[in-house]
Amino acid sequence: MSNVYERWKEFYEDAISRDIPGVKTAEKIAYFGIGGSGIPGEVLKLLDLPVEYKLFRSYKVNVDSKTTVVAVSYSGNTAETLAGVKRAQELGVKEIIVITSGGKLKEIAESKGYPLLSLPQGYQTRFIFPYIFTYLVRILNQSTGSNYRVQDLVDGIQDNFTMLSEVSTRIANRITGKVPIFYASDLLPIAERFKQEVNENAKYPAFFSQLPEANHNEIELYSSQQGNQFIPIVIPSDKIDEATASLINAELIYPPYKSILKNISGMFLIAGLASVKLASQLNIKAEELRIIPKIRERTHNLLMGG
């Protein structure tokens, strides 16, 4: 399954080349998405956003009629996102931009004339991050007058692919036999993505935590025998992060670039490759999901009826 991540450069390029519908100037933006469709909205917080931005990774949403909603569901049938869209419509939201591969959400977009950005079918949601996030940056540029260079997402992979792959191998090897806790401050969404990738691809326990908050509670666990079962991994963005890493003997993953978009694509690639390499070591099928589809179905029945 690592070959999917090895195609990410191609995915970014394809997402950049695709036509996207015109979107209106936004006063406020709200993002609806959960799971693999939710983390792109979390990562968007790493950019310098010129408008008010809210992220809803739940079916409980609170927006007004002046808000531009970006609703993302890879399958198009995610109950939480569909419920959020229904609530946004009830609250008078007029501009709802839809990113999906099909399903009920696509039907809603087509029937209401909402701007629709299509995703390729046949993948697990986490593998399609390049499409979703590229679309988001392009929407941001178009709706707010931002000028982010989307080509940086491609360059973040192609400029140092060999190095990124080597780092992923190092991380996979360090995790084996330990429970990783990924720490970050300014780059917390990247730490969360590492955690998610290890969970889904390797079916392996992993957690993430925020610095410097963890310096005032969590890091004390490394002074005990119980702490030996964990491997701390720090994604540093300042001297305090580095000081923490030194104190708890953490593994470090340094963002390799000055450009935030290059760091996002590069670090997300490391996370994906590391998780499938760990899965391979554990003889786990990275692409296979057994429990998540069951809770999706139960959630859909609870929220949408069925």
From Swiss-Prot:
The keyword rRNA-binding is assigned to this record: no
Domain of life: Archaea
Active site: 200 (proton acceptor), 216 (proton donor), 296 (proton acceptor)
Function in brief: Involved in the synthesis of UDP-N-acetylgalactosamine (UDP-GalNAc). Catalyzes the conversion of glucosamine-6-phosphate (GlcN-6-P) to galactosamine-6-phosphate (GalN-6-P).
Family note: Belongs to the PGI/PMI family.
One GO term (biological process): carbohydrate derivative metabolic process
Entry protein name: D-glucosamine-6-phosphate 4-epimerase
Keywords: Isomerase
Domain SIS intervals: 19-153
Cited InterPro entries: Glu6P/Mann6P_isomerase_C (IPR019490), SIS_dom (IPR001347), SIS_dom_sf (IPR046348), SIS_PGI/PMI_1 (IPR035484)
One GO molecular-function entry: mannose-6-phosphate isomerase activity
Cross-referenced PROSITE patterns: SIS (PS51464)
Top EC group: isomerase
SUPFAM superfamilies: SIS domain
Catalysed reaction, written as an equation: D-glucosamine 6-phosphate = D-galactosamine 6-phosphate
Alphabetical list of Pfam families matching this protein: bact-PGI_C (PF10432), SIS (PF01380)
CDD domains linked to this entry: SIS_PGI_PMI_1 (cd05017), SIS_PGI_PMI_2 (cd05637)
Organism: Sulfolobus acidocaldarius (strain ATCC 33909 / DSM 639 / JCM 8929 / NBRC 15157 / NCIMB 11770)
Enzyme Commission number: 5.1.3.42
